[in-house]
Amino acid sequence: MDIDEPGWPLIDDFFRAEADGRSAPTVRRYERVRRRLMSFLDTGDMSLGLGTQPAALLEAERQFHDTGAFWTLLGPEELICCLPSFLHETWLPERTGEARTQISLVGRLLTALRRRHDFDWRVVSCAHLEAQAAVEQARRDLADRPAEPWTKAHELPARMRRESGPEW
């Protein structure tokens, strides 16, 4: 992606501001969400958010650019339209904490975009409301997701796991 493309500073400035003052593990989680968002914009199916014709045009542009095709053709207004797809189960990480971080950051990105005054909000207000609804739905879906098994449980001694054995 070229540094002059409008999406580069928009996304980078947002994630930099969000990470400012956070702990190192949180900053790493934010960076993983940022990379997933960039990958989504470079490879994701945008037909749901943009419609079939703009999505087909974007797909054609992707044939010429490995990265940044989204920002070559589209801008922040279209980003708002596409963010609900980024909250779909296929783009959410399996780990609940990572998924929660992604959902939270998308919600905060929508708020940051809403504060910008260089948009024609009459055009994107419905898409913004749909994206906010998608954030709320993703939060509800995540709450219904089964809890992750504790991966270090096998490292505990049998007596701590309450498994029957010669210690009993």
For each feature predicted by the language model, list its residue ranges.
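Charge-rich, intrinsically disordered N-terminal extensions
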Residues: 1-92, 96-122, 131-168
